[in-house]
Amino acid sequence: MRTLWQHCHVATMAEGRYSAIEDAAIVTSAGLIEWIGPRAELAPVEADRTVDLGGAWVTPGLIDCHTHAVFGGNRSGEFEQRLQGVSYAEIAAQGGGIASTVRATRAASEDELFASARQRVQALMRDGVTTIEIKSGYGLDLANERKMLRVARRLADELPLAVRATCLAAHALPPEYAGRADDYIAHICDEMLPALAAEGLVDAVDAFCEHLAFSPAQVERLFIKARALGLPVKLHAEQLSSLHGSSLAARYQALSADHLEFMTEEDAIAMAKAGTVAVLLPGAFYFLRETQLPPMDALRRHGVKIALASDLNPGTSPGLSLRLMLNMGCTCFRMTPEEALAGVTVHAATALGLGDSHGSLEVGKVADFVAWQIERPADLAYWLGGDLPKRVVRKGHEISN
């Protein structure tokens, strides 16, 4: 069906800028953008449907390119403990932290995980999200990592949403491998990853490169295996210290390196040369009350593409609003509203390997967009919370009004 969408203004986000078109029109057909531009330049078109957008601003559908949306349990009790002065180490010694989420995730059925994840993902969708990445990493064995990734695939099947599934088995050491990180990495490489990839459950491979997780050498073994399986890689890097994980990610042409508060200028140069996207996660920065800012000037100076994401997870960023992350990117990390919007559209798409099909409003790309009743695009980063009036369009079909 061919649809004409008109009486709108468009922030196309092509090349990471607003690239605004006022008094615009969009023609969609077969789920793709067939034409976009000033309405005055549109030749007569035979449309099956014409939609008046009432002067709305249209942006690409928002993309949350880093989430841990599938998990069992709840860690709000730990939040209370931390605010009362209990340290993370003390909480972990009590069996809390990521270990508690692993236990709860392992104990939950696939249906239970699906039901809880669906609620969280639908909250993000209400913010205009049309594409999401979901990581595993709370199962830490083959059966439970498979269970998490199957839930990610089910969410894609049952919701009007594009989902990319990332295997993050190298998130933490499972209790059965305590003190044997090398053995666990070997288990992932030799058994878990080949099996999950063969089942079609994995779009990318991620790891947590940090003193309390896995070393650069261990991560590199995982990257070599991912490359052999034809899978792109991503990396949690430089969140708490500098191990130059982001440079390692760049050497393997990673889609992205994420967090990056402690990255160096040399890391930024390596990422720029490799085309690796910097995914910033202000929700975790805020929730953990961190003080080390990502090196924004170095990222800009060397032309690294910068994305933003929710990092939705139960321990360090229980954030259900990607629009809130736009504001946090501006207020915490000193991004401009234009940079922030690019970070949840065109650059987020690149961070998922979807840059050719998603993230900007251009002819031939997927017709995922949101029509917002706002005065200017910066409003999306300005307003804190609330449900801005909007229409959400996925593959040319309206899914929310």
Curated annotation (Swiss-Prot):
Chief place where the protein resides: cytoplasm
UniProt GO cellular component terms: cytoplasm
EC identifiers of the protein: 3.5.2.7
Biological or metabolic pathway of the protein: Amino-acid degradation; L-histidine degradation into L-glutamate; N-formimidoyl-L-glutamate from L-histidine: step 3/3
Protein's gene: hutI
A GO MF term: zinc ion binding
UniProt KW keywords: Cytoplasm, Histidine metabolism, Hydrolase, Iron, Metal-binding, Zinc
Keyword Nucleotide-binding: no
Transmembrane segments: none
GO biological process: L-histidine catabolic process to glutamate and formamide; L-histidine catabolic process to glutamate and formate
Tagged with keyword Zinc: yes
Protein name: Imidazolonepropionase
Entry binding sites for Zn(2+): 66, 68, 236, 311
Species per Swiss-Prot/TrEMBL record: Pseudomonas putida (strain GB-1)
Binding site for N-formimidoyl-L-glutamate: 138, 313, 315
Cofactor binding: number and manner: Binds 1 zinc or iron ion per subunit.
InterPro entries hit by this protein: Amidohydro-rel, HutI, Metal-dep_hydrolase_composite, Metal_Hydrolase
Cofactor(s) named in the record: Zn(2+); Fe(3+)
